[in-house]
Amino acid sequence: MSGCEEEAGDGYSSAEDEDYVPSGAEYSEEDESELLREEEEEAAGPRPTRSRNSPRQATRRKKKKRRGLVLEVDEKEEGKAQENEDEEDDLKQSEKDREEEEKKKEDALWASFLSDVGQKPKAAATQATHADKAGEVKSVNKLQGKPKESEKPKDSGRVTITKVFDFAGEEVRVTKEVDSSSKEAKSFLKQQEKWQSSAPGSLPTVSGVKRPSGISSLLGKIGSKKQKMSTLEKSKLDWENFKEEEGIVEELAIHNRGKDGYIERKAFLERVDHRQFEIERDIRLSRMKP
């Protein structure tokens, strides 16, 4: 009895017991079944009290104590795991907050840079899109306006004149457009009216034979009376045709209007001759006076 009392006393050490199980060790199936049975008995009702120092009660106390130690160890491990998870969450949150602060700083720097420059990328992009749309609208309007200009009647301000010449037995046709108010156009129109009026009003027509009329008849009359063309006129005509084919009419006109152009030199010499003539005339008039 004295041995049992010593084991149940306050100086009892579980490490000295033969049935001692270290903390964290698993229970055997027998221990678990016995513990469950004890819990059921305690829940069923009070049992007759036995001696506190009985060996059965001592073993029960040992097992309960071991179970309490295991539960404490599990709770400590769970608490440590929870603390580790909380620390990881805090680290992630702090990193996220730091990234947001850096992003805000970058945005502030970029906004200050744009305010110093005085331009905003979005505004510039919108202006570019508006400019592109305006250019497209203008180009469409131009394309729509060009056909209207081409639809104007040809005889509103220009007259096409076709002349037939005879150069060394060869028929040469010259076609050009002139203003309707020019002398050449007026004379051509008068001549055309004269030929139309001189044509017989009523000639007997034969069935199946069509009488030539309009421009074809006029060209036939012009062809019957071909004008002679000189070599100088033929060379001038060839030169004009060559300029039109090569597309150098405007370039030659600009060059001739320059200081080194032939026309400008010719005009300068004419002005000098005219000025010299005026000086000589003034001298003669001054001598003739008494």
From Swiss-Prot:
One of its GO terms (biological process) is chromatin remodeling. Residues 159-208 are annotated as: Hydrophilic. It comes from the Eukaryota. Its main location: nucleus. The gene is CFDP1. Keywords: Centromere, Chromosome, Developmental protein, Kinetochore. May play a role during embryogenesis. GO terms for cellular component: kinetochore; Swr1 complex. Residues 1-20, 27-43 have a biased composition (Acidic residues). Pfam families: BCNT. Residues 120-129, 213-222 have a biased composition (Low complexity). This is Craniofacial development protein 1. PANTHER family: CRANIOFACIAL DEVELOPMENT PROTEIN 1 (PTHR48407:SF1).
